[in-house]
Amino acid sequence: MSTNDANFMLFSNINDCSYVSCYCEENVWKLCEQVKKTYPSELPKCYAVFVSNERRTVPLWRQKAGRGDEKLVIWDYHVFFMHNPSPNRCLVFDLDTTLPFPTYFHKYVTETFRSDYALTPEHHRFFRVIPAEKYLAEFSSDRRHMRRPDGSWIKPPPSYPPIQTSASTHSLDDFICMKPGKGPGAVYDLLHFVQQFYKPPDRNIGTKTQN
């Protein structure tokens, strides 16, 4: 299928994607790597998105690790992958959601983040959006955040070696940080994140504007 086809999907089967529980930042890095290998022309249209806040307490719904019928969980941070091939089409690939893989941006945001209005300020979600190419070049992690004080693993790590760059062995905190103007990519609050990536259908097309 051509990448210009309206039904084209970068990843057609979630089971073909690299996945290790509780290592969402590496899972998304692997998705970026896969696109670079298989559909390099699409890489400029792809993003890694970190969700967190100053207190690192962000509520997300529809998560496999969540509780209750609505699958609510509070993470310190979360990471998902986005493909934005055209202004009116943006798909979210989240390996940890109970929603379909992928899910259209508006549905994903509506069901996963809902609204900040009903939440206390310390639970408001912020989003660091990083172009996939930049994420591949600058992200690194020695997985220290997944070790207990005695050195044992909180969750088993991926079988492949830690992701490193020539400049850093552990840049994860730079990506989790939600201070605007600091770190890679751009930081948005929920409202501006939606405005940036969701373009509602133009219902005024074909109608005459009255002055």
Swiss-Prot record:
Q: Which GO terms describe its molecular function?
A: protein-N-terminal asparagine amidohydrolase activity; protein-N-terminal glutamine amidohydrolase activity
Q: What is its EC number?
A: 3.5.1.122
What keywords is this UniProt entry annotated with? Hydrolase
Q: Which reaction does it catalyse?
A: N-terminal L-glutaminyl-[protein] + H2O = N-terminal L-glutamyl-[protein] + NH4(+)
EC category: hydrolase
Function as written in the Swiss-Prot or TrEMBL entry: Mediates the side-chain deamidation of N-terminal glutamine residues to glutamate, an important step in N-end rule pathway of protein degradation. Conversion of the resulting N-terminal glutamine to glutamate renders the protein susceptible to arginylation, polyubiquitination and degradation as specified by the N-end rule. Does not act on substrates with internal or C-terminal glutamine and does not act on non-glutamine residues in any position.
Write down the superkingdom of origin.
Answer: Eukaryota
Record-annotated membrane-spanning stretches: none
Q: Which cysteines are joined by disulfide bonds?
A: none
- Listed InterPro entries: N_Gln_amidohydro_ab_roll_sf, NTAQ1, Prot_N_Gln_amidohydro_ab_roll
In which family does this protein belong, per the annotation? Belongs to the NTAQ1 family.
Keyword Hydrolase assigned to the entry: answer is: yes
Q: Which gene encodes it?
A: tun
- Tell me the Pfam families matching this sequence: Nt_Gln_amidase (PF09764)
Q: Does the keyword Chaperone apply?
A: no
The record places the active site at: 24, 78, 94
What protein name applies here? Answer: Protein N-terminal glutamine amidohydrolase
Subunit composition and interactions: Monomer.
List, alphabetically, the GO terms of the cellular component aspect: cytosol; nucleus
